[in-house]
Amino acid sequence: MTQQRPLSHVMVVEDDRDTREVVKLILEMEGMGVTEAADGFEALDRLHKLRELDPHRPCAIVLDIMMPRCSGAEFRKRQLDDPLIADVPIIVLSAIADQLRTDDLHAFARVAKPFDPDQLIKVVRRACDESVES
């Protein structure tokens, strides 16, 4: 039996392994493929590899802000400076999300931790739908 590729593929960038695993599980239960990264540098590397395989993947990035080595803000700056990956929308998932203006990061949306799984799913689906349309 051939395994079908998920319709939506999302990258989750989160330094806390437990949170990353929970987000991954929630998205996979919704039929989405997930690529994980523990910080911004790892995310940039994996994002390039995904884009080389398929220019439409991932359809969105769920991004923590407070991470060691390369923060979410630094990741976003580097992402926007790179034409190959600049168009992938981000969803800020952070305990400080309420203090951030998504305009500052050109984010698609923000979800505050602790998060409601249904809200996260709805926002990710909307980002992926809009990403596919553009």
What are these regions (language model features)?
Residues 1-11, 24, 51-55, 116-134:
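Non-catalytic signal-transmission and effector/linker regions of two-component phosphorelay proteins
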